[in-house]
Amino acid sequence: MFHSSAMVNSHRKPMFNIHRGFYCLTAILPQICICSQFSVPSSYHFTEDPGAFPVATNGERFPWQELRLPSVVIPLHYDLFVHPNLTSLDFVASEKIEVLVSNATQFIILHSKDLEITNATLQSEEDSRYMKPGKELKVLSYPAHEQIALLVPEKLTPHLKYYVAMDFQAKLGDGFEGFYKSTYRTLGGETRILAVTDFEPTQARMAFPCFDEPLFKANFSIKIRRESRHIALSNMPKVKTIELEGGLLEDHFETTVKMSTYLVAYIVCDFHSLSGFTSSGVKVSIYASPDKRNQTHYALQASLKLLDFYEKYFDIYYPLSKLDLIAIPDFAPGAMENWGLITYRETSLLFDPKTSSASDKLWVTRVIAHELAHQWFGNLVTMEWWNDIWLKEGFAKYMELIAVNATYPELQFDDYFLNVCFEVITKDSLNSSRPISKPAETPTQIQEMFDEVSYNKGACILNMLKDFLGEEKFQKGIIQYLKKFSYRNAKNDDLWSSLSNSCLESDFTSGGVCHSDPKMTSNMLAFLGENAEVKEMMTTWTLQKGIPLLVVKQDGCSLRLQQERFLQGVFQEDPEWRALQERYLWHIPLTYSTSSSNVIHRHILKSKTDTLDLPEKTSWVKFNVDSNGYYIVHYEGHGWDQLITQLNQNHTLLRPKDRVGLIHDVFQLVGAGRLTLDKALDMTYYLQHETSSPALLEGLSYLESFYHMMDRRNISDISENLKRYLLQYFKPVIDRQSWSDKGSVWDRMLRSALLKLACDLNHAPCIQKAAELFSQWMESSGKLNIPTDVLKIVYSVGAQTTAGWNYLLEQYELSMSSAEQNKILYALSTSKHQEKLLKLIELGMEGKVIKTQNLAALLHAIARRPKGQQLAWDFVRENWTHLLKKFDLGSYDIRMIISGTTAHFSSKDKLQEVKLFFESLEAQGSHLDIFQTVLETITKNIKWLEKNLPTLRTWLMVNT
């Protein structure tokens, strides 16, 4: 799954930007695998005290008390029939589940949520063979655990197969989960309906009763009944279509490969497609609503290239004969990797050359790469439980880097990947962060696992490990992992084992070391000679939260190293700092270079302190080469002064990514109280001469964030001086920008960012040019093609007049491009009129003109503006109950609404307001980890201002 708001730029600044066989032995495998994959809990007894068991909806004792299902009944195969009615907006369905019993039991527990089960029967394998009718089963329901119990008349016999049949029905959902309805508007203004599924993590149970846990893999044979004006899609290719009385059609699909329930998918719609074939013969089709089929060309081209790449890289063929990618008009995540039928937000799949920018193209490519990687990581090999979702999400995020670099090098995603790591450091440097692997039991807890820690940090530690082991060894290890656990489930240790043993016999040196390099220290060579230590090292990154700080002190040719836990908002002088440092120790694969040589040196820091000897005297040393390591570096003594001097004298002696890393680390260290703000600001002087777009964008992002912080707090003297400094020092590079779509991807993204900043700061030439283009666009009735990279800027300037704002809202409703709609919606959110902002929020809640899927990002964008911050916060408090009717408590949307409307606060009054609101929610039984994250973030903001405001004021007075 790809989670990201369609309107939140992934450069840590909230903006509207688009930025998510093998059938042999199947009869034998289930019996072989039961012992290794499933075990009966030791506490599993049927004679427990009745008082210990929950009560079903009919008042009877429910025979199971755990959130996790018992493993005494294993599903092998589902026959599923579904008939959705897109007029009455409901569906009827039936299923027959083949199960294998491992222990005697008188009940079968499975998941079901909001389904009306009208009939349930049980047949033994022998009864089925002789066509004997099934025996009626009593159904008990326990909604608190989303479980049902099927009570059997006599105990089921171990090692025998049975068939459970059920008839059921339900309404198509109004939200974004289970089997739900979506709508779209045609070019002619007609509203049409489709029915679509989204099951991850625990919503398959809303569409059919099932064993809805990733460990319960099975095969699925699906039949869908529909009207002739619609098509039906599912995971597998269609085998045949049967014509029924009354004009209905019934599509039968091939039986799936063995897979988890959350990957099942089916859709009934009237979409059109564009298709092509990979070099290995897989048919790839891109589906979209009929009027948007012309926006599917790029997605098809990218999908074909990426699928070919993955088959070669993983040395495993994609196991299905087709792969469909479909753009869903109403879809909560960025995308979902259902095997063979990947569902996307329109903004994550469709590309319109007239309205999609360079960053839009990068976004679409990334999300396609992410979901296609899941066809191996997640689908072919699945985590045993949701506590380890990083095994699929971290890998898919990491494979974006590998795959996009290989297939579209011109997109220069290698440079962009730094942001993936920088984004998560913001959260991981708070005490409220969590380990990558963390227990999660309830549906809400499971949903909360879909966050930056699983995705971004997971990807970053994999990239660090790849850099450490070497690309070839790392690739061999993951191929071994995928082949060993195909169609099975895996856990962390299985991955480390595969990566530890990825050295082939021919790879070893005479000394028994799998990788040899003269720049490695002796402890690095020793480590690589002891492959088992991969697990020992990596568990320090997956089982403890946070990020390490490497403190470096140079003394002649000697380097003294010390590691600490890096914490934002908690300073060394604070009483709690020392306690928060205890028991934290990482095995850090260090890299460093010096002013004397381009050689990259390597060393593993496994202790709190260590000493390194340099081969020669050097004026500076730079750790974390290319920012491949997941750690912050602080240079004590004159270390920072020497690096800043080098940047000012000749910044090109430091590698481009190292310059980005230095800018990032220096400002992060200010937030941790380890450096004064003036030291970090002094570093920005050199940016006048910087030609690398990533470094320029990194520096500008911090300066711009300070400006917005002052603007929201109405600290006008500082905000005006910051504006003056930005326009004074960056005017040459701003004035060099053309209002066009020319240049490399990074040239274009820099242009968008610089011109947006200039117009935000009311730079007269920028405002004048944007207003001129907007007037021409209005006069052309929206037909003028404005360069896509400046489209959002032009719309934002135009939205500042009532006539412009109203016209944009009209165009938003008429537009057939989701990319353009995102840019318009961002522009509308920049209005300084609160009644207009409130209208946008109301339209988002209603969900017709502005789809509810965009509400979280809309609130986030409005809250960042001085005129919108209180409005958005008040709206959330007053409409919390209504918001929970639209989004699940643990959903990404709810978490984004909470953080997006509160995390920018920086006063004690606001901290108290937010704290009281969270306490009131917890009193009602609603608890989320994001509550503590937000409170810590606001506290961090308060402390940042207290510590740095006088310095910022003084520095600006001297430098403007």
Swiss-Prot record:
Ubiquitously expressed. Highly expressed in spleen and leukocytes. GO terms for molecular function: aminopeptidase activity; endopeptidase activity; metalloaminopeptidase activity; metallopeptidase activity; peptide binding; zinc ion binding. Its cofactor is Zn(2+). One of its GO terms (cellular component) is extracellular space. The keyword Phosphoprotein does not apply. Its main location: endoplasmic reticulum. It is a single-pass type II membrane protein. Disulfide bonds join 421-460, 759-766. PROSITE patterns: ZINC_PROTEASE (PS00142). Keywords: Adaptive immunity, Aminopeptidase, Disulfide bond, Endoplasmic reticulum, Glycoprotein, Hydrolase, Immunity, Membrane, Metal-binding, Metalloprotease, Protease, Signal-anchor, Transmembrane, Transmembrane helix, Zinc. GO terms for biological process: adaptive immune response; antigen processing and presentation of endogenous peptide antigen via MHC class I; antigen processing and presentation of peptide antigen via MHC class I; peptide catabolic process; proteolysis; regulation of blood pressure. The active site is at residue 371. N-glycosylated. Residues 41-960 are lumenal. Residues 1-20 are cytoplasmic. Zn(2+) binds at residues 370, 374, 393. Heterodimer with ERAP1. Belongs to the peptidase M1 family. Aminopeptidase that plays a central role in peptide trimming, a step required for the generation of most HLA class I-binding peptides. Peptide trimming is essential to customize longer precursor peptides to fit them to the correct length required for presentation on MHC class I molecules. Preferentially hydrolyzes the basic residues Arg and Lys. This is Endoplasmic reticulum aminopeptidase 2. It comes from Homo sapiens (Human).
